[in-house]
């Protein structure tokens, strides 16, 4: 070491701010400094691997064994991380360690951007930022480095306490690569324990493809040995043809802490503009917190086999939050801490691709393994329904995944697909009919279904809270429109078998006009209908008005509800209506009409604005 060569520099102002931020607030988990340094060492080795491919005269495969080594010096309170990667020149040290985001990786990629080889995307990150995390646990950091293209013994030493200045000097270093020496703070003694370092490496860097070795010193024999800590090959990087079913299942359990086997999984390697590997699992059961909006649900993110974060939500839409697994990107951009993904175009591409992959997997399952898909739907169907509103781009395939109960199915289990419904439609049926209600039983007994049952027309039954909201976005399927049986539908008459119907429309004109005058602004309209059999009247909402179920959803959420004016449809063939039609006393006629209207409202909404008045009218008829 020649002190005459030592030159002191001041950090770039942004670096000073970064150091202060990192040391005092940025990283909540101090141990990730080791992850960052190992990641940087891995980057440096990947770079020299590239040089071996394109400068074969200088670097020979059989003369180079990549390695990352870690030594702990308890007495000196030091951790030393070394690699035999590409290293840095004197100028690169000043450029990369004195400024932000100029680690050499970005410049290196710019240099090779015209090379038509996939290896050019084989480097990650911004070295400088991660390197600064060393100061979270260190009083001082020393970096010894020599670039692989420099002559032997021409190296550089960089030293800083992270307080605004750093020194650089030329030194003699025989091997290319970098040694990072951390002088730990007195409060960070835990990182001097070998078991602690091993656990951190297994947690964050177990899947680094380069062997990571730790130094063991035997006090008795006074000998040093090196122990490999990481597996050095991630499961998802292995050819899927060489992975057993049990290995996939065991990895899922390790990944999720789920005691059960997954329902299914998908393992793919994608090469092209973006290169990444994904290993995705669909569980058999939902997690306890799947409805907790404050909890994040996402994939484990790796970049070049380096663990970056849990619950990376950027890669899947919220309605696929039940999916577990990993994504391992070769060139994904990261932000300053590596813990929050940049909202980049690459992220959007990966999200789009992964979403389509999962939906296609589910669609294939629904077509080829109905029993297994039904198990999936019974657990996660209600979450898939969210996608209809959230993901217009994939609405078609999402619609294929939907399952319903119906009046013909005769049970609450949702097993009917829309394709099956359409296949069984009547010849003259032009719409897909559905009903929404608070419960399956309530929907099944709705008077709105009477004429459909009589005419053997199936109706989808939707009784989950999300259904009404979903149907506002699901307006058609395969060019066939959906029609709520609780809304006005002037085309329904073409489906009905009208028996014993003469000229009621003409003879009931006076009845209709009198009813309109009695109900006044309580109704939007009063009409004759033949869709009823055992019920005297029903109320419907107009085509573009808010439905009763949607109003209930708004009310439950504390949202203001617009005044709903119903359309009263009267069954002229019902005995009670015929009896009322003959009443001459205007007061009695009026009371009967109000009772019929309240009954219809009660049947539709399940409640009345003034139930006491309704009961009073009923009682008056009992005693009259």
From Swiss-Prot:
- In residue numbers, the region (A) covers 1-338
Quote the protein name from its UniProt record: Chaperone protein HtpG
Q: Does the keyword Transferase apply?
A: no
Which segments carry the region annotation B? 339-552
What is one cellular component GO term in this UniProt entry? Answer: cytoplasm
Could you list this entry's UniProt keywords, alphabetically sorted. Answer: ATP-binding, Chaperone, Cytoplasm, Nucleotide-binding, Stress response
The record's comment on protein family reads: Belongs to the heat shock protein 90 family.
Cellular localization per UniProt: Cytoplasm
Biological source species: Buchnera aphidicola subsp. Cinara cedri (strain Cc)
Function, as annotated: Molecular chaperone. Has ATPase activity.
Q: What is its main location?
A: cytoplasm
Q: What is the lineage of its organism?
A: Bacteria, Pseudomonadati, Pseudomonadota, Gammaproteobacteria, Enterobacterales
Q: Name one GO molecular function term.
A: unfolded protein binding
- Region C, as annotated, extends over 553-624
Q: How does it assemble?
A: Homodimer.
